[in-house]
Amino acid sequence: MSADELNIQQYKKMTETPIPKLILGLAVPTILSMLITSIYNLADTFFVGQISTSASGAVGIVSSLMAIIQALGFTLGHGSGTIISRSLGSRNTEAATRFASTSFFTALAVGVVLAVVGLATLPSFMMLLGSTETILPHACAYARPILIAAPLMISSLVMNNILRYEGKANFAMIGLVTGGVLNIVLDPIFMFGLGLGTAGAGIATALSQSISFCILLSMFLRGKTVSQFRIAAVTREAREFGMILVGGAPSFGRQGLQSIGGMLLNIAARSYGDAAVAGMSIVSRIFMFIISVAIGVGQGLQPVAAFNYGARKFRRVRQAAIFTMGAAFCMLVVLVSLCWVNSDALIRLFRDDPEVTAVALPAFHYQCLAILLQPVIVVANMTFQSVGKAGRATFLACCRQGVFFIPLILILPRTLGLVGVETCQPIADVFTFIVSLPFLLAFLNQLSRMDDAEKARSAS
């Protein structure tokens, strides 16, 4: 099938399929991908936790490194993806290929820079991310293979997002799920079978992500996509690079500040010992799993919102946002209820240490309550990013981990002690919800007015 035929087929799918069927069709593969990714993160936490409390703390330190990798990948992936989707919505396939090529080759180059700088300064880098002296050997051993694979990991995130924004979430899922399952299988083999310890966890992650990269790249090389990767198509215009960076700024704010927030959380927790760092790390990994459902549904919304906004079908954008909020909320209620009932056993599964549980359990309960606000936060952020409202999207993306969390993590532990460490994230979530809701409601009303104006223009 030619690129033009693929584009026509995809246009009909994205602009005519009923919204619930379309969103769920795109969201289910994305949710599965994110759940598998979260499961292999939890698997790392579980297997590393069998070594020692200090090793378990290293998972939290390397999580901040992973957040940096994700920030770079999502910035380029979301930044180009929203433009690609809107370009396909307006039937401009040449622009789609240009932005896809630019983001992919830029990701490879950025990954090489991160790998070189990170490996050259590894011990200092890990201390900067919040490591203690006892955690440091584990953190360095874990991080080294991941840094080596950073160029492929960042590029994989770009390809994953381009596939999703083209409406091909199933293809994106194949690459991510394969990598995730492989990671889970390889963890115990490298860590215990080969006796490599925390270094084995890093090698398993790096190897599985490299295989995921190869699978995702094959989708583009085999002509499964409308946009393609060509060196000659990489833009020479600073304005178009700027468009990618502006479009990806919300993702950079979200993921970059998550890295900074994770670093500050580790620093605040390490005042209370390795058990506190390990406990907060376990809670963060569990909630990464839970929140991946809301984010997965939200990522199902993104190509629908971007494509239909580009096609000037504003009512479908509004319907998609409202449906996504309802679906995400229902899924979170079920998950949170199950986790609350089994919270103690869930935490002990990852590290059966009374000191770790004493820190993790209250933090877990606080976050269970606040996470039910996430559907509004996620939909507001992703809707604005998808339709090209980068300013609003960036501001809202920076609220959760930046505008609110960073001041709270600097202030509350000084005034409330360990309770301040445990309550920072849920309090930041409440404030972010309060800010996001009026932004979203105003835009939904604006979409209704834009749809009425579009109908009047078509009728005249």
What kind of region is each of these model predictions?
Residues E16, P20-I39, A43, L65-L72, ...:
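Residue-level signal for short hydrophobic patches within transmembrane helices
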Residues I68-A71, N183-P188, F213-L217, F289-S292, ...:
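Hydrophobic transmembrane alpha-helices of multi-pass small-molecule transporters
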